[in-house]
A protein has these predicted regions:
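Hydrophobic transmembrane alpha-helices and their helix-loop junctions in integral membrane proteins
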Residues: 1-6, 23-36, 48-268
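Membrane-interfacial loop-to-transmembrane alpha-helix junctions, especially the N-terminal start
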Residues: 10-15
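Mid-membrane cores of alpha-helical transmembrane segments in multi-pass membrane proteins
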Residues: 18-21
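Short phosphate-coordinating micro-motif centered on Lys-Gly-acidic
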Residues: 43
Length: 268
């Protein structure tokens, strides 16, 4: 109730700093052309997200800590994949990687690197069954940042995965095709399980969290197609879902604010 009536959230220490760092991380992921810098910006975004979630209260701290532990595993796998690519090619520049990785497309190291990227980004983007952090994170996130986090936190890793699959890796390679097939299967499972779990929830934000698991499944299926139509579909759905999910969180916040102000006995 203090959040919607007294605007106490505006005075929470570190809120604007964390929000600014989150924006910096997202912007850096877009403009960078280096896979290690991408890791740095991804972690700036993630650490800021952990902090914004933790500002929401006691339950938020537990949700943020759980997200931190799981997210660190995803980041470590991504960094391990970067290490394998560097060992094979001797460069971290994306344009150079795309050219130098070609002779190694059938090597075991490349297969391990692809697996690390798929699992690492899968954790970060809450792909089923690696979505365990998302329901609590969305439900207990700081109300002043929940809409932004819901719209961007899982889409940014999806964007990074798109850059790897379509720009650095070759989608016609058997190793990459096998990884994309697994990604597609997980996407279908995520759509089914996420939708069923969303319909079973009584908390609006938790329902939207499981709905996001299903929507990430659609993006994964677009990626798994490995062609231009799948690429266009994945990008359009990622943009659409970012705006749609943020808007739904804002709508829910508006309803809660209205009922708290109009109905004194209403509990948010």
């Amino acid at each position: 109730r203090p959040f919607v009536t007294d605007e106490a959230w505006l005075h929470v220490g570190g809120y604007y700093t964390l929000f600014g760092l989150l924006t910096v991380g997202l912007s850096g992921m877009i403009i960078t052309g280096d896979v290690f810098n991408l890791y740095v910006y991804l972690e700036i975004m993630s650490l800021s997200g952990y902090g914004l979630i933790a500002l929401g209260g006691r339950k938020s701290m537990l949700a943020a800590f759980r997200y931190l532990l799981i997210g660190t595993i995803g980041a470590s796998l991504y960094l391990l994949g970067v290490g394998y690519l560097y060992a094979m090619t001797g460069t971290l520049n994306m344009a150079d990687l795309a050219a130098r990785v070609v002779p190694h497309l059938n090597s075991p190291l490349f297969a391990i690197a692809v697996a690390c990227f798929i699992i690492g980004f899968g954790i970060k983007m809450a792909l089923f069954p690696l979505h365990g952090w998302q329901p609590d994170a969305y439900t207990f996130a700081h109300p002043g940042a929940a809409a932004f986090i819901a719209g961007c936190m899982s889409k940014a890793p999806a964007y990074a995965l798109i850059r790897f699959v379509y720009y650095i890796f070759k989608v016609d390679n058997p190793v990459v095709q096998s990884a994309l097939n697994v990604l597609g299967i997980l996407g279908v499972a995520g759509i089914l399980i996420g939708s069923i779990m969303a319909m079973a929830q009584y908390d609006f934000r938790r329902m939207l969290a499981y709905s996001s698991v299903a929507q990430i499944g659609y993006i994964a299926i677009g990626l798994a197609m490995g062609n231009m139509y799948g690429f266009i579909g994945a990008v359009l759905h990622a943009i659409n879902h970012a705006f749609m999910k943020s808007s739904l969180f804002l709508v829910i916040g508006g309803f809660v604010c209205f009922f708290v102000c109009v109905c004194p006995g209403f509990s948010a």
